[in-house]
């Protein structure tokens, strides 16, 4: 813990923390949004959404793909006759997939992604994926998962995608312990972590999802895994069913979180404390210095999180402990107490945490509190800006590389920038 965190009073027992639970109208994107970063990560995969024109517009808008680009996602649009049961949706899906694979021979992994419309008509994409995978094997593997927005939030799309992959991961055959880092990370962040793990002597490290489908990690009883993202409960459960063991750790946001995350791996692999300090200290010092220029702008600022990305708890820990921001309310769509236990220990004991959403009630509390900055979804940002509040889009925190030491200052800047912009507008 650095000196700047010493004044915080942390809760000693995460299970004893009082959490407000709300169930009402919510304001979030659906899981289809995860395709935007997943299609960039797995470079020989294609994501075929089986949905409506609204689904197609959402993905196209979120990805910002230009009309002359050829992305690795698309939508098999369901028309009214499909929804009415006047056509065989499976025959049409087979035709579209056959055309797609013939046109794009670079595709090695195809995901059929369910949506609200496909789930409403009970289209069984898992059976379709099995049928198509048998047809196009071994050149193309076909899997399915749900990106439906019914009672979900947008980061659950990645969880569903990775969970669908775990059962088909190869089984590890060796007896040597290996480390698996779970959750999409930008390539630059992944490379930084590889260098740190190599320095610590943890050489057998794999990342999931990998950069291409031919590099899928092996999993077994000797696999220890670190979650790089806090929104992967289904993936973690599937890995545990394969015998892998999760390492309890905070998430790698900021200096403190990254150090705790790396230390969990170091302890599990018997790395000497002196070696750990030697390897991590240069990056820690560099990150601390980079954060200094944002502390004056952010210290004492009051912060309100609407539930959106499931990153809220680790972000609140980073901003309160390393940048001395005050937490008015930390809303999160779902609170997995086991996976977030190390984070909850570090949050101020008096932090107000809300699980779930009743957007009208939360808007009332936000307006009453008048925080300095509000982290929320796109649908709430513009109305709140019109009311004179400063906002930060929650989805930007998922699209931007923010994990690790070298990105700590970039993460801080994401919160400082809106405040600086507001100050200039007022002036």
Curated annotation (Swiss-Prot):
GO terms for biological process: light-independent bacteriochlorophyll biosynthetic process; photosynthesis, dark reaction. Protochlorophyllide reductase is composed of three subunits; BchL, BchN and BchB. Forms a heterotetramer of two BchB and two BchN subunits. It catalyses: chlorophyllide a + oxidized 2[4Fe-4S]-[ferredoxin] + 2 ADP + 2 phosphate = protochlorophyllide a + reduced 2[4Fe-4S]-[ferredoxin] + 2 ATP + 2 H2O. HAMAP family: ChlN_BchN. InterPro entries: LIPOR_BchN/ChlN (IPR050293), Nase/OxRdtase_comp1 (IPR000510), Protochl_reductN (IPR005970). Component of the dark-operative protochlorophyllide reductase (DPOR) that uses Mg-ATP and reduced ferredoxin to reduce ring D of protochlorophyllide (Pchlide) to form chlorophyllide a (Chlide). This reaction is light-independent. The NB-protein (BchN-BchB) is the catalytic component of the complex. Belongs to the BchN/ChlN family. Pathway: Porphyrin-containing compound metabolism; bacteriochlorophyll biosynthesis (light-independent). It is an enzyme of class 1 (oxidoreductase). Its cofactor is [4Fe-4S] cluster. One of its GO terms (molecular function) is ATP binding. This is Light-independent protochlorophyllide reductase subunit N. NCBIfam families: DPOR_bchN (TIGR01279), PRK02842.1 (NF002768). It comes from Rhodopseudomonas palustris (strain BisA53). Keywords: 4Fe-4S, ATP-binding, Bacteriochlorophyll biosynthesis, Chlorophyll biosynthesis, Iron, Iron-sulfur, Metal-binding, Nucleotide-binding, Oxidoreductase, Photosynthesis. The lineage of its organism: Bacteria, Pseudomonadati, Pseudomonadota, Alphaproteobacteria, Hyphomicrobiales. Binds 1 [4Fe-4S] cluster per heterodimer. The cluster is bound at the heterodimer interface by residues from both subunits. Its EC number is 1.3.7.7. [4Fe-4S] cluster binds at residues 30, 55, 116. SUPFAM superfamilies: Helical backbone' metal receptor (SSF53807).
